[in-house]
Structures are given as C-alpha cells and as structure tokens.
Regions:
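Short, positively charged
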Residues: 108-139, 273-309, 366
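A short glycine-rich beta-alpha junction/loop motif
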Residues: 73, 89-96, 128-158, 264-267, ...
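Short, Lys/Arg- and Gly-enriched loop/turn segments at beta-strand edges
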Residues: 77-84
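Conserved "cap/hinge" positions at secondary-structure junctions
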Residues: 74-75, 230
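Short peripheral tails and domain-boundary helices/loops at the edges of structured domains
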Residues: 89-109
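Sequence-specific dsDNA recognition surfaces
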Residues: 4-22, 34-69, 200-245, 251, ...
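Non-catalytic DNA-recognition/assembly elements of restriction-modification systems
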Residues: 1-18, 143-227, 316, 320-366
Length: 367
C-alpha cells in the first residue's frame, strides 16, 4: 500500500461558514462539532437549528450532501462523519466537507481511512499551534495523500467495517426502543402519584471512584467504564455489580443504567436502590432530567450536582405489589439493553482492531 494519491485529484474540499447564526427551536439543522462523536458518527440528539433565511446564507459556501465526509479542523480536531440521507442543514463553524468526485474511490472506504491510526498520526504532524486553539489547514488539506488501492479492495474493506457498524447501530436502535417502552410503562404506572417519601429513603451509594477518565482512555479492560461523557470506556476491574445508575456530577445532567459488573470515573456518581427498586430509580431520574439540570446542578462556571439537595427530593415510592408488576415488565428490557451494550463494546474492539490491519495491508480479504 505504498502507492498514494493526492486528495485534490479525487475529492473537492469545502470550508464551512466562519460565523454562528441565531439558533431556533426547529428548522434546518445547524451541524456543530458537538454533534460529531469521537468514533465518527452523527449524533442527532446534539443538533441545533437555524431559520430558513439564515440557512440560505449559511450554505453559500457549501450545502452538505448525502455521502459527504464532514470533518473538524479547529479546536476539537480530527472528528470525521458521513452526512446521512435526508440531511437538510448547514455546517457549523470549524467544520469542512470532503466530497468524493472520483469513480475510483469508495467514499465509505475513504471515511474509514480518515478514522485510521495511520491518518490520525499523519494529521498530528500537520497541526498548526495557535495562541488560543490549534487547527488543521483547510487550504493544505487537498494536498495531503491517501493510499491508492484498487476500488475492489476498497469496497471489501468498507463492507466489512460497515457491517460491524450496522450491527452496533441496530443494537443502539433496539436499546432506544426498549428504553422508550420502559419509560412509557413507568409514566403510565406512576406519573402524578402523590409523594410518600424522599429519594434518600431508597438510595444506596457506591464507593467514590478514584479513577480519572484519562486513565481509562488508555485501558483495554473488559468491563464497561462509565463517565460524565457519552462514551463508555473500558476498565480492568469492576467496582460494582448488579443494577446500577450512573449520574454525571459536573456539566449537564445525564443518567445511565447498566446491569452487570462495571466501573466508573471520579466525576460519576454510582447509585442503586434497596427494595429491588433500581430500575424504578433510573426511570424516575430520567423523568425528572430537566429538573436535574435546572434545580440540582448549581455553581458558577461549571455546574455540579448537589447530591444532598437531590437526596431530599420528595418522590412516590410504590408498594411491593405495584413494584413487582412493574419489575416483571421492565427488568427483562434493561437486561437486553445491557446485553446489547456488552455486545457493542466487543464489536467496537473488533472494528478498531481490524481498521488499521485492513488499511495497512497486514490483514487481507479473500474473495
């Protein structure tokens, strides 16, 4: 794979707008860096929006199309993602588009190459240090090179890696649907009930973790490691087992749930419940998530979760019979969600192992 081709011979590269429009509740998508994950996916939950009038202005440079590769070139560097079907929106600041115009290049293969360690290492050498933020030169980007291999081999590589990603996406979709069903059951069964206790009456706190997120990023352990971010990392040893909730303690409110052995970071509060109420506790916390942000996260600058305040929140505590009926319905759902999460972690490890091997030719695909 020593032969290479210059990007400008196969692609067009477009810089995005250099300003931020007024955000709206709905309308065309304003695609910001926050909506692109570290592992190369578009997270629609992070979409912002702008008006139709501003959309016209913000797409003068380029209108994102299905199959375009979007990448970040300033501040948060090196994020790449594919523009999905039916995307209607514009690029945000510090983003650019790579548009394949060659029949000899498979766009999906090119996308995966940009996620490879080889490319990441190369881009690291091209970073321009700034007084406030670092950046990659969009002007120089078209002069960089990628491997020049046959379209047949490109398609084989892309097919294998995309099949893994499709299975991960399917599991995530199943999990989203199961969570929505469990939440509906909770709301139908308990919404509007008169409080008869406090959160601290059912709360069980796990020991505080001493492991920083940065340490876990270097780990290749087998246990899921929960943080105050969206990504689930890995750790060598579990801190807890059973049915546990993991809450952000800084920034914005978020709650995760997992069944099984797991670990967590210093900025994550791990809690469960006595009386077999952990699943109930999780859905209760999800139901008050806006309140968590507005009332229980306080402080100047970076806000932090006020645990004593939250513990004293009045809640409804169901009796044994109601809880038993509820658990019979939702426990199996969360068991499946956690099984899918475990499978996804294994698939991610497989994909990330295969990616560099396929790209540098150490692994080949037979017909």
């Amino acid at each position: 794979m020593s032969e290479r081709i210059v990007i400008k011979e196969i692609c067009e590269v477009y810089d995005g707008p250099h300003a931020t429009p007024k955000k709206t509740v709905d309308g065309p998508v304003y695609l910001g860096i926050d909506a692109i994950t570290d592992d190369g996916k578009i997270n629609a939950k992070e979409f912002a929006h702008l008006s139709e009038e501003d959309y016209i202005k913000w797409t003068k440079r380029v209108t994102p199309q299905y199959g375009d590769i979007v990448f970040s070139y300033e501040a948060t560097l090196g994020r790449y993602a594919l523009i999905p079907k039916d995307f209607y929106g514009c690029l945000g600041r510090r983003l650019a588009i790579i548009r394949n115009v060659s029949k000899d290049i498979d766009t999906l293969w090119l996308y995966y190459y940009f996620l490879s360690p080889e490319w990441k290492q190369f881009i690291q050498s091209k970073i321009i240090k700034g007084s406030t933020v670092n950046r990659i030169s969009v002007e120089d980007f078209p002069t960089y090179t990628v491997p020049n291999i046959s379209i047949k081999v490109q398609c084989k590589i892309a097919n294998i890696l995309s099949k893994i990603d499709e299975k991960i996406a399917l599991n995530n979709n199943i999990n989203d649907n199961l969570l929505a069903m469990a939440y509906d059951i909770y709301m139908y069964s308990f919404y509007g009930k008169i409080p008869n206790g406090k959160l601290k009456d059912i709360l069980v706190e796990a020991d505080k973790s001493s492991v920083q997120v940065g340490e876990a990023k270097q780990s290749t352990g087998e246990y899921p490691f929960f943080t105050s971010g969206s990504a689930i990392l890995k750790w060598d040893t579990p801190f807890v087992n059973g049915r546990n909730c993991f809450l952000n303690t800084g920034g914005n409110a978020d709650v995760k749930f997992y069944v099984g052995e797991a670990a967590y970071s210093t900025d994550t509060w791990c809690i469960s419940s006595n009386k077999n109420m952990s699943d109930y506790l999780y859905l209760l916390l999800i139901s008050i998530k806006p309140e968590l942000n507005q009332k229980f996260f306080q402080g100047t600058g970076l806000k932090h979760l006020q645990k004593p305040l939250l513990k004293n929140r009045h809640i409804y505590i169901p009796d044994f019979e109601k809880l038993q009926i509820f658990n019979e319905q939702v426990n199996p759902m969360f068991n499946v969600i956690s099984e899918n999460t475990r499978e996804n972690q294994e698939l991610i490890v497989l994909r990330d192992w295969l990616l560099p091997m396929l790209m540098n030719g150490q692994a080949t695909i037979s017909d």
